[in-house]
């Protein structure tokens, strides 16, 4: 693993050492042998090692793949564990959480007790509704903290943000460990767990700067680790069920190999100010690539170094060649139609996933629920695959796949059979695999990296707060009005997921060409002033001697041959 970068670079050099005639006839590759061809093929799969961002210094000079492994372990153990909600709620039920809401007779026996009469995990509907509220509350808090953590990440750097997130995780699980029937601490426990989720996840994304040209893949690798963390509650609940260990002991044990481990990794291997973009203060952006559309190519070079007026003006011109929205201000990007639509898309995703998690035991048998618990941690598999697909064909097509998975999740849930329940569970696994990562990849490839943390934080905040709508949908409509029948809300969610295709189509249209809606630039005057300064700067004539978008100018701002946008 330590030599993977050098091997990839060597293979790339050997492939490009052929003369044109030899390469076309295959003689050069035959001379190099099968080993060289294999290394060349692997070099095409691995992230590039020949760009400045891939060669920057790391803590203790660790190989970037080792660092990625450490970050992935932290995300796996302390990521969005509360998304494994069916298992986590089962632990709360086993600990008699909110049992005081259920009526008792004179002898202190619960009447009725749905555990005995219907084989449910909960005693009464009131207890079930109270526990299920915790999920949307935790999701909303996590998204709220995502906005704050994004700002902290931009201002304070990854180290302090990661430490804060892990300490919040630790406090939350300690509260959960010491919750009892007489002293229920579930609300503060889940609040702290929610606060720590994205606060400990977002700082690990700084490693994407070590893999220029593969940011989509790296984000989804970390996202896959977060998806695998859905299995942590399943493991803990299995220990409680099969080994007679109390919820308290299991929760305390988890604190050591979860949050405490995260603190140690942060102190040793997390940079204080993020990874330097590269020696010149530049980073390599990667707009979505795909087939049949004509935006500028990927890996465009954005210069963030301080310089004279002419250098800044030249940078303004270069950024405009790629995508005007990238060079605009935060507020311009925030009020753009692209950002509005991706946030709207995520709001519907949060509604669909939240209600499904809450009502799973109402829609399916316990056998299907058990399959959901097992499949959710395996969502890291489609997460990685879809991440690579996003790099190849673009995030818009991935959004289409994700929405189709969500739609089929609800379509299969209408049929009251275990077979269709298993199909629904499989679709839900795919739907959850890129729950927030799909937004991360879209924002990363569309907007300025200077505002990455704030934009994804605000999108998560909006989706999280509005996910609370599913609480009254579940409690007031499904449980109270419809006597536990989720059919009405299932139909509503299915309709919303159908409407989602409209937003996806518009986002694809905005990426497909120079639509007048592309930028929604309310700072047009500022852009015109910047362009004027560029034209009046010293040396402007030399810089503009080539036609706009010509090969000579594009060669200065691209690292690899351009590909089409998805």
Curated annotation (Swiss-Prot):
Residues glycosylated per entry: 476
Domain of life: Eukaryota
Stated induction or repression of this protein's expression: Expression is not affected by changes in arginine or lysine concentrations in the environment.
Reactions catalysed: L-lysine(in) = L-lysine(out); L-arginine(in) = L-arginine(out); L-methionine(in) = L-methionine(out); L-leucine(in) = L-leucine(out)
Record keyword Glycoprotein present: yes
Knockout-associated phenotype: Repeated attempts to generate a knockout failed. Conditional knockdown results in impaired parasite proliferation. Reduced uptake of lysine and arginine.
Entry keywords, A to Z: Amino-acid transport, Cell membrane, Glycoprotein, Membrane, Transmembrane, Transmembrane helix, Transport
TM annotation in the entry: 65-85, 137-157, 158-178, 187-207, 216-236, 250-270, 334-354, 367-387, 392-412, 423-443, 455-475, 489-509
Subcellular locations according to the entry: Cell membrane
SUPFAM superfamilies: MFS general substrate transporter
Signal sequence annotation: none
Membrane topology term: Multi-pass membrane protein
PANTHER family: PROTEIN FMP42
Protein function: Cationic and neutral amino acid transporter. Transports lysine with high affinity. Can transport arginine, methionine and leucine. Does not require inorganic ions, such as sodium, chloride, potassium, calcium or magnesium, for transport activity.
Entry similarity comment: Belongs to the SLC43A transporter (TC 2.A.1.44) family.
UniProt name for this protein: Amino acid transporter 6-1
Species: Toxoplasma gondii (strain ATCC 50611 / Me49)
């Amino acid at each position: 693993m330590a030599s993977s970068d050098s091997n990839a670079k060597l293979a790339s050099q050997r492939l490009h050492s052929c003369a044109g005639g030899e390469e076309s006839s295959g003689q050069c590759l035959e001379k190099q042998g099968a080993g060289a061809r294999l290394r060349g093929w692997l070099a095409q799969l691995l992230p590039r090692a020949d760009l400045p961002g891939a060669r920057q210094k790391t803590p203790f000079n660790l190989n970037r793949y080792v660092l990625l492994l450490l970050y992935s372990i932290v995300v796996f153990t302390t990521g969005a564990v509360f998304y494994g909600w069916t298992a986590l709620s089962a632990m709360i039920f086993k600990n008699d959480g909110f049992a005081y809401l259920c009526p008792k007779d004179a002898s202190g026996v619960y009447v009725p007790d749905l555990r005995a009469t219907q084989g449910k995990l909960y005693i009464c509907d009131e207890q079930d509704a109270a526990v299920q509220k915790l999920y949307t509350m935790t999701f909303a808090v996590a998204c709220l903290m995502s906005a704050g953590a994004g700002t902290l990440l931009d201002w304070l750097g990854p180290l302090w943000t990661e430490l804060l997130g892990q300490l919040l995780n630790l406090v939350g699980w300690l509260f959960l460990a010491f919750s009892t029937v007489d002293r229920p601490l579930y609300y503060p426990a889940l609040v702290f767990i929610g606060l720590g989720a994205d606060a400990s996840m977002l700082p690990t994304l700084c490693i994407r700067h070590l893999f220029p040209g593969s940011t989509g893949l790296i984000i989804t690798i970390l996202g896959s680790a977060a998806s695998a963390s859905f299995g942590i509650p399943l493991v803990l609940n299995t220990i409680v069920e099969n080994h007679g260990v109390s919820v308290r002991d299991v929760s305390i044990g988890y604190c050591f190999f979860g949050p405490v481990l995260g603190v140690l990794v942060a102190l040793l291997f997390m940079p204080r100010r993020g990874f330097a973009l590269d020696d010149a203060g530049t980073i390599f952006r990667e707009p979505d690539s795909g087939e049949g559309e004509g935006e500028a190519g990927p890996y465009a070079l954005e210069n963030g170094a301080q310089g004279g007026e002419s250098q800044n003006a030249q940078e303004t011109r270069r950024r405009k060649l790629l995508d005007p929205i990238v060079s605009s201000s935060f507020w311009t990007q925030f009020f753009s139609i692209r950002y509005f639509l991706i946030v709207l898309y995520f709001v519907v995703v949060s509604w669909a996933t939240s209600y499904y998690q809450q009502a799973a035991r109402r829609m399916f048998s316990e056998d299907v629920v058990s399959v959901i618990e097992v499949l959710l941690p395996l969502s890291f598999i489609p997460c990685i695959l879809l991440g690579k697909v996003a790099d190849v064909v673009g995030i818009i097509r991935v959004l289409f796949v994700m929405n189709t998975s969500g739609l089929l999740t609800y379509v299969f849930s209408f049929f009251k059979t275990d077979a269709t329940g298993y199909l629904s569970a499989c679709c839900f696994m795919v739907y959850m695999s890129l729950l927030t990562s799909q937004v991360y990849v879209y924002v990363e490839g569309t907007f300025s990296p200077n505002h990455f943390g704030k934009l994804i934080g605000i999108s998560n905040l909006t989706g999280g707060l509005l996910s609370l709508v599913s609480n009254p949908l579940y409690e007031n409509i499904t449980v109270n009005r419809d006597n536990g029948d989720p059919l009405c809300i299932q139909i509503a969610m299915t309709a919303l997921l159908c409407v989602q295709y409209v937003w996806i189509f518009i986002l694809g249209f905005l990426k497909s060409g120079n639509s007048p809606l592309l930028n929604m630039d309310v700072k047009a005057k500022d852009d015109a002033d910047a362009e004027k300064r560029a034209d009046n700067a010293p040396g402007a004539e030399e810089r503009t001697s080539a036609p706009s978008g010509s090969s000579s100018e594009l060669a200065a701002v691209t690292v690899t041959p351009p590909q089409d946008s998805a």
